[in-house]
Design a protein with these regions (language model features):
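Nucleotide/pyrophosphate-binding catalytic subdomain
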Residues: 1-103
């Protein structure tokens, strides 16, 4: 999970924000550090333990809506957190769909 947080939550997140800035947009990072908007639980599999793979339980929209009202572009890393504060890697397409549905 350390590598996932570094690559998705920091490196790629920052690259996208830089890209947006280069093209006139202002991105705001929603990652595992500041805005923990993805509440998740560990994904269950009957055959094997999937490790730190999660599924979305809930998207917290308050901070997302505030940033959108300020014309900021949310850049969301697909990293959720469970009830025990454990970080979980979630499929980015699933996160995008859940965010769209929650908004």
């Amino acid at each position: 999970m350390k590598v996932v947080k570094k690559v998705l939550g920091e490196n790629i997140n920052n690259e996208i924000i830089q890209f947006l800035r280069t093209h006139g947009g202002i991105g705001i990072p929603f990652n595992h550090k500041k805005y923990k908007i993805i509440k998740a639980s560990k994904k269950q599999n009957d055959t094997i333990d999937l490790g730190y793979v999660g599924e979305v339980d809930k998207i917290l929209t308050k901070e997302l809506k505030l940033s959108l009202k300020k014309d900021l572009i949310p850049v969301i890393a697909p990293i959720g957190q469970d009830r025990k504060k454990q970080f979980l890697n979630i499929n980015a397409d699933v996160v995008a769909g859940e965010v769209a549905q929650a908004l």
